[in-house]
Amino acid sequence: MTQISERLLVQAHLDAKQPNPLTAEQEAEYRAAIAAELKAQNAVLVAHYYCDPVIQALAEETGGCVSDSLEMARFGKNHPAETVIVAGVRFMGETAKILTPEKRVLMPTLEATCSLDLGCPVEEFSAFCDQHPERTVVVYANTSAAVKARADWVVTSSCALEIVESLMDNGETIIWGPDQHLGRYIQKQTGADMLLWDGACIVHEEFKSRQLADMKALYPDAAILVHPESPEAVIELADAVGSTSQLIKAAQTLPNKTFIVATDRGIFYKMQQLCPDKEFVEAPTAGNGAACRSCAHCPWMAMNTLERVLDCLRKGGDEIFVDPALVPKAIKPLNRMLDFTQAARLKLSGNA
């Protein structure tokens, strides 16, 4: 990690702290005020699984959406609301704006970014792509609008395997960016010819196989759930590997009563909601930076607070804008992803 991104991480972590935690009464007041503003402004709140539980609960109770980044994009595009509040990180807000440029897209804070986005500047990535013009460019959704505009395909972790497999079946070779661990996992699963960008998620990269094996010894009957942004040695210990939505599904379907979960702890809200009779344990990390990386929670996701949600609704200042010149280029790979996954859904339902 560069010194610049490390400093940004520290600042994000500090900004996320709430010096005066809300009382139950204050929290209820914020939730009521936000619900009223959403209704008055014909707005909808979409939240990622990694947001704090109170934000996820608020999205659910106000008719919004709690999901992975793929379903967030689909929900925001299809919902009739004039304004979409995206509780997540900046690339999610940009994606919503690209798909529905006619809508107003707000975020609780525009400072909520992503280490994968920061680690893939468009100038450097474009130069890398230009060196291999014969390859199909596939980028993870955790990238800027400018990087998406340079890509042929955008994927999320829930559909990346299937899309890469389809491209491989067509004889295409691939440039993959920016998450090296997810790229390596896909490469290993599919056998695709892929050149990998050297990026990583600051949360998932902190999971360590030795500590995970030690924890497994403490919980011998537990199943290990791992997000594929984790290092290869961690993935090798998993009983199930997948996106956030896929890990939640695994928690529901596997017979185990205890799960060791190697992803952001924000996902525990939905897992515990759907599986109240099961126990979920945070996988150990080994963070040693200036910020609190030893606890598995994205500091930028933590910046989505009730106060900021209400503030962005009342002031409208944290609005997402995307360069109009980028939108026609960026929407093509995004729509390819949405069309591909929709076709896969229809095929699956037809075979049911």
Curated annotation (Swiss-Prot):
[4Fe-4S] cluster binds at residues 114, 201, 298. Its main location: cytoplasm. Iminosuccinate binds at residues 48, 69, 140-142, 157, 227-229, 244. Binds 1 [4Fe-4S] cluster per subunit. Its cofactor is [4Fe-4S] cluster. It is found in: Cytoplasm. GO terms for biological process: 'de novo' NAD biosynthetic process from L-aspartate. Keywords: 4Fe-4S, Cytoplasm, Iron, Iron-sulfur, Metal-binding, Pyridine nucleotide biosynthesis, Transferase. Belongs to the quinolinate synthase family. Type 1 subfamily. This is Quinolinate synthase. It comes from Pseudomonas putida (strain GB-1).
